Amino acid sequence: MPGWSCLVTGAGGFLGQRIVQLLMQEKDLEEIRVLDKFFRPETREQFFNLDTNIKVTVLEGDILDTQYLRKACQGISVVIHTAAVIDVTGVIPRQTILDVNLKGTQNLLEACIQASVPAFIFSSSVDVAGPNSYKEIILNGNEEEHHESIWSDPYPYSKKMAEKAVLAANGSMLKIGGTLHTCALRPMYIYGERSPFISNTIITALKNKNILGCTGKFSTANPVYVGNVAWAHILAARGLRDPKKSPNIQGEFYYISDDTPHQSYDDLNYTLSKEWGFCPDSSWSLPVPLLYWLAFMLETVSFLLSPIYRFIPPFNRHLVTLTGSTFTFSYKKAQRDLGYEPLVSWEEAKQKTSEWIGTLVEQHRETLDTKSQ
């Protein structure tokens, strides 16, 4: 395949950075453009100091700026779109999430058409499939079962509608000829080094005598390591550029999991952190049906107060369902069409993540030592 170029949106994020790292090893790749609204100084420096012959262009811009997006897409072969606002707690305003996740994706698709970018890979989420009820049990589900979220909460709704827009855009005519080919990847809950969710869990536990918060004791999930999700994006980029593989991938979506054991979110947090003296919360937990009812009451109060006060419930029905369900999916379709096999084993992923958690513990100790001086 001839030399090519790739634009990665959300490149300063947890997943985006890992995708860029793997792209550096791709043959015939001539340029990577990394786009985000804001890069931390250390991330920006990391991109500038990469030991590579590949041209790396750092772009800071808003995904809602259509003119900027069009310039960013000029001369690009593949767009990998990971930029998103992730919030299942209701803290971030609904319109902000819809603007970035849905409108931003629509803007980027239009920019690709105007700049004649032939391939578009969308980082979707398992949230677009559900779970819709904590009573529903999905074990090793697959794409043919056509699960679809019915939640109106902004994150699952915006990702679902954005994915629909991406897949509907497959086959669109490009401005100077040719066709846009798209696909979407639906990773499970992503863990690994620099996970913002795990980081928050650990930092909170460090302030609570190393007791891990209870976030999903009654769930059964199949978490996926960030390096394996990034690898799936690389394979999708290869596949859409390969004339033999591309027809099977165009307009398709894929669940991305790996060989991480099925477990609850609480068990995952404990397994990854127990080496550093963390322990699970042994206190009694409310059953899921009661939590769901309480969430409904809190949401009702929030709605009634909304004309005069913005009350954000500590949890909502979507979050209770998400963290109280059995909801797992197979990666067989990605294996068949993309040639996907997990790049990193569970044991290696566990070790890498645990070692990183150790650095968080050390940083916390150093902070306490500094304050005590």
Swiss-Prot record:
The chain crosses the membrane at residues 288-308. One of its GO terms (molecular function) is steroid Delta-isomerase activity. InterPro entries: 3Beta_OHSteriod_DH/Estase, Lipid_A_modif_metabolic_enz, NAD(P)-bd_dom_sf. Expressed in skin and testis. It comes from the Eukaryota. Gene3D superfamilies: NAD(P)-binding Rossmann-like Domain. NAD(+) binds at residue 159. The active site is at residue 155. GO terms for biological process: steroid biosynthetic process. The keyword Transmembrane helix applies. It holds the Pfam family 3Beta_HSD. It is a single-pass membrane protein. Pathway: Lipid metabolism; steroid biosynthesis. It is found in: Endoplasmic reticulum membrane; Mitochondrion membrane. The keyword Transmembrane helix applies. Its EC number is 1.1.1.-, 1.1.1.145, 5.3.3.1. One of its GO terms (cellular component) is mitochondrial membrane. It catalyses: a 3beta-hydroxy-Delta(5)-steroid + NAD(+) = a 3-oxo-Delta(5)-steroid + NADH + H(+); a 3-oxo-Delta(5)-steroid = a 3-oxo-Delta(4)-steroid. Keywords: Endoplasmic reticulum, Isomerase, Membrane, Mitochondrion, Multifunctional enzyme, NAD, Oxidoreductase, Steroidogenesis, Transmembrane, Transmembrane helix. 3-beta-HSD is a bifunctional enzyme, that catalyzes the oxidative conversion of Delta(5)-ene-3-beta-hydroxy steroid, and the oxidative conversion of ketosteroids. The 3-beta-HSD enzymatic system plays a crucial role in the biosynthesis of all classes of hormonal steroids. May be involved in local production of progesterone. PANTHER family: BIFUNCTIONAL POLYMYXIN RESISTANCE PROTEIN ARNA, SHORT CHAIN DEHYDROGENASE_REDUCTASE FAMILY 42E, MEMBER 2. Belongs to the 3-beta-HSD family. This is 3 beta-hydroxysteroid dehydrogenase/Delta 5-->4-isomerase type 6. It comes from Mus musculus (Mouse). The gene is Hsd3b6.
